[in-house]
Design a protein with these regions (language model features):
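Core alpha/beta nucleotide-donor-binding catalytic domains of modification enzymes
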Residues: 1-208, 237
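AMP-forming adenylation/ATP pyrophosphatase catalytic core
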Residues: 2-30, 44-47, 51, 82-84, ...
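Catalytic cores of large soluble enzymes that bind and process phosphate-bearing ligands
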Residues: 58, 99, 167, 171, ...
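Mid-to-C-terminal catalytic subdomains of enzymes
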Residues: 124, 176-219, 223-226, 308, ...
Length: 368
């Protein structure tokens, strides 16, 4: 195991400062235990954060085990929990998706509590391959084929703290070997063998089958991820320019997009705009597929309808003559194009002109 190479990734790709604290998501399994070892050896002020999903009988005892892992290494320990199964039913999500959402909310809350510079998780090269295959099977675009980045600023969980994944080029087999050589005893999650979970079926059934066709399948998929990430990075400034052109208005409740500007874009950029809208309004949603994107592109081309319609993940939209307005929640936002008074109360002398939002002006006179 080349720890010097991982240090280079932590420094250059994750862009972390060794003098500032980092919250580590630690389940106690081989990957996260290895991540904890690496960060302690590199000299980071480490905060160990463990989340109990209450999905398995042994989950409570695992909390104590991970707490002991932190104590041995003289690291502060944060603990969170929720009834993920009940939340999944209530929110109409899969257990996998709800577990991920609940866990990340907890991790970034812990990062805020200790003023950490980042949250680090132990996704490996194997996890990257599985993620890309999942995206591919769901009909993803280039963003899905890019997989997970080493450092993510726009993850949706926290606007100021990045999510970093230092182990994306480290294979699970290497980690297992390291744990064995160092006498480390990680926890084992039996649910990793349960085929009712989609990722497990990818890992335990699909990948071995595909490796019969090409034994270097995983290495090739990892290379594909890097190629796509580099391509997207090269186009980043161009995509930003497009976003500036189409965005009419943004606040905490809505995104307003210039319909005419959106329609003028090449199809590839229209797709990028829609994926960015989804990332801003529903960052926890990961299954934006080709059909959903194409249907929205088609809807935007037809004459406007003032009726609010559902899109995905609790995002709704309606069209005006000049814009399409995306929002989340049950409350219909104000029509951006209509005259609005921004402040709740405002003095106005009858006879004078009052400037409103969006270039509107209000003028009054007394008629006797």
């Amino acid at each position: 195991m080349d720890l010097l190479y991982i240090k280079t990734i932590v420094d250059k790709r994750c862009n972390l400062d060794v003098s500032l604290p980092v919250v580590l998501g630690v389940s106690g399994g081989p990957d996260s235990l290895f991540l904890l070892e690496v960060f302690v050896q590199l000299g980071f002020p480490v905060v160990v954060a463990h989340f109990n999903h209450h999905l398995r009988p042994e989950a409570d005892s695992e909390v104590r085990t991970v707490e002991q892992m932190a104590k041995i290494r003289k690291c502060p320990f944060f603990f969170g929990e929720s009834d993920v199964k009940a939340e999944a039913v209530s929110n109409k999500r899969s257990i996998e998706e709800q577990a991920r959402i609940s866990r990340y909310y907890f991790l970034f809350h812990a990062a805020d509590e200790v003023n950490a510079q980042a949250v680090a998780v132990a996704h490996t090269a194997d996890d990257q391959v599985e993620t890309i295959l999942m995206h591919f099977l769901r009909g993803s675009g280039l963003n899905g084929l890019a997989g997970m980045p080493f450092r993510s600023e726009e993850h949706g969980w926290n606007s100021t703290k990045p999510l970093v994944r230092p182990l994306l080029e480290t294979w699970r087999e290497e980690i297992e070997m390291y744990c064995h050589e160092k006498g480390l005893t990680p926890l084992r999650d039996p649910s990793n063998l349960d085929s009712q979970y989609y990722r497990n079926r990818i890992r335990n059934e699909l990948i071995p089958l595909l490796e019969d066709f090409n034994p270097k399948l995983k290495e090739h998929i990892l290379n594909l991820s890097q190629i796509v990430q580099d391509e997207l990075a090269a186009k980043k400034s161009e995509i930003l320019d497009v976003w500036v052109r189409v965005l009419a208005h943004q606040d905490e409740s809505q995104l307003v997009i210039h319909t005419s500007e959106l329609r003028k874009l090449e199809l590839a950029f229209q797709r990028q705009v829609l994926r960015k809208i989804q990332m801003i309004l529903a960052p926890e949603f990961r299954n934006l597929d080709f059909v959903t994107v194409e249907r929205m592109i088609h809807n935007i081309q037809i004459p406007f309808s003032s009726a609010s319609q559902d899109w995905i993940a609790g995002i709704h939209y309606f069209q005006t003559r000049k814009a399409v307005i995306f929002y989340r929640g049950n409350e219909l936002p104000l029509d951006y194009e209509s005259p609005q008074i921004i402040k709740k109360s405002r003095e106005w002398d009858i006879g004078s002109i009052l400037s409103l939002a969006n270039g509107w002006k209000l003028k009054g006179e007394i008629i006797s």
